[in-house]
Amino acid sequence: MRYFIFFGYDGTNYHGWQIQPNANSVQQELQRALSILLRKEMEVVGAGRTDTGVHARHMAAHFDTDRIPMEPDQLVYRLNRILPRDIAVYEVREVAPEMHARFSAISRTYHYYIHTRKDPFERHYSLQISYPLNFEKMNEAAQHFLHHEDYAAFCKAGGDNKTTICHVTAARWIQTSPTTWYFEITANRFLRNMVRAVVGTLIDVGREKITMEQFLDILHNGSRSDAGESMPGNALFLEEVGYDFKD
């Protein structure tokens, strides 16, 4: 039987989602907890990979097993007793056997947070900017993502992507306080480091390091070296993974 598990985590102390040698990962912690409770070695498949220090408010994964020997809510409770305090499970649900955490996802939404003044309480979860930014221009530039498909310019060099085509359905800067903004972007898929490179390039637009014409050239020429730098991962949150559940 196949089960989906929905959870969130603070990525500060993890080297990303995926298991890797000699480094702590969220996948490792989740598999360890499931293996203890179900009394056999478990493998979980995530909706995607988050990099070192990146957070997730609502991540999804699946695992296969015989019917779990308890109610899903009880499994959630017991998992949260075992897992570290920076990982929280919200829901476990049985799904159709063909549902796949990664390949059945129809959308993913990320938020990237910026503070325009120094804030000691947000320093671990946002990028703190000391220079002025023109968010109106940044939003104007972001709208071009809705009509563009090839994101080679924002893909980490040497990646293993078979294609750099992504379908972006939302891209905008949203202000939540006089000094707090976040960039929201939704797409069917993302390339490695894509969101952080997109944010870095939009910041270059906002601080007028590049013109709108130069931004459009970057968008269309596909050269990673021309785009902005990849922003730090601590301000990036995987906000939601969308599925079309039939039940």
Outline where the language-model segments fall.
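Structured-RNA-binding interfaces characteristic of tRNA pseudouridine synthases
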Residues: M1-D247
